[in-house]
């Protein structure tokens, strides 16, 4: 017991004090890299508990749930202007093929928002209210990212709205890029006279690889541009590599568990997918915020 207590005390002293005084230039590259990543992990754990990231993720999950339908409506309004709304609908049904009832519900409400906005002045006012819900959600995302970076002052309102509008315009095309890669691959096989079903395994690998790449790119942009602080892109990218891979794995598991939800559809209908959807959003924000903490740690590890 004394030996265990002594080793525990030494480990605590090393992690709390000694590791921060090590001169990395005196170590080999491998050891220096290991110590640096240990410091990054310690900074992330410390800021994670201090900023109460778990509670922040729950709050953002609530805001995201409120803005799902308005966000989908805005995306369809934007893609509809480019003639891509049908392609996006096809993508959603194929991607969430075990939750078609809840997709029907979300798309139905989203279409109602669009139709109402086009029919009358009051409908336009309602649509603007829904757009404000999205803006409100994104402003809360910025607030949480600023908390991670210990930034007290937010951008002025014009810059915040400009960034949010840019994100709303770009986000549908990020989704379409992901969809387009799989679509082009399938049509290339058909053009070459090859059986698409015979290459289904390769298609799955390409689809998930593309999903991971899009996730890494999206998260790196979030970590770089959302905080009201200078963030080196290399640090944002390294953090995004972790969160993008973790998010892709979580997404795969989410789609696999929808098979279980399908069995409950006969009893609960579309509501069977709601608890799993809420858990998915919560874990997703948890992963994204850990990535934000990592980007902060990478940038300040040598301070």
Where do the model's predicted regions map?
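Membrane-embedded alpha-helices and immediately adjacent juxtamembrane helical segments
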Residues: 2-303
């Amino acid at each position: 017991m004394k030996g265990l207590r002594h080793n525990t005390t030494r480990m605590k002293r090393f992690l709390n004090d000694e590791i921060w005084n090590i001169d990395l230039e005196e170590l080999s590259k491998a050891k220096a890299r290991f110590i640096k990543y240990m410091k990054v992990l310690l900074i992330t754990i410390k800021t994670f508990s201090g900023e109460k990231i778990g509670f922040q993720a729950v709050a953002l999950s609530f805001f995201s749930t409120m803005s799902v339908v308005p966000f989908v409506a805005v995306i369809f309004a934007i893609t509809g202007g480019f003639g891509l709304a049908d392609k996006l609908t096809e993508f959603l049904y194929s991607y969430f093929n075990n939750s078609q009832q809840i997709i029907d519900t979300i798309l139905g409400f989203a279409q109602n928002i669009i139709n109402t906005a086009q029919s009358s002045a009051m409908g336009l006012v309602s649509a603007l209210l829904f757009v404000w819900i999205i803006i409100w959600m994104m402003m809360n995302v910025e607030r949480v990212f600023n908390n991670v970076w210990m930034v007290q002052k937010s951008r002025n309102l014009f810059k915040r709205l400009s960034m949010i509008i840019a994100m709303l315009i770009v986000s549908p095309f990020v989704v379409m890029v992901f969809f387009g890669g799989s679509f082009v691959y399938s049509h290339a096989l058909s053009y070459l006279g090859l059986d698409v079903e015979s290459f289904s395994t390769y298609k799955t690998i390409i689809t998930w690889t593309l999903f991971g790449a899009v996730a890494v790119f999206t998260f790196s942009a979030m970590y770089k541009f959302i905080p009201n602080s200078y963030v080196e892109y290399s640090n944002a990218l390294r953090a995004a590599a972790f969160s993008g891979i973790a998010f892709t794995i979580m997404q795969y598991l989410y789609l696999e568990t929808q098979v279980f939800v399908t069995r409950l559809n006969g009893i609960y209908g579309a509501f069977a997918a709601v608890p799993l959807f809420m858990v998915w959003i919560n874990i997703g924000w948890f992963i994204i915020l850990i990535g934000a903490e990592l980007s902060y740690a990478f940038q300040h590890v040598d301070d």
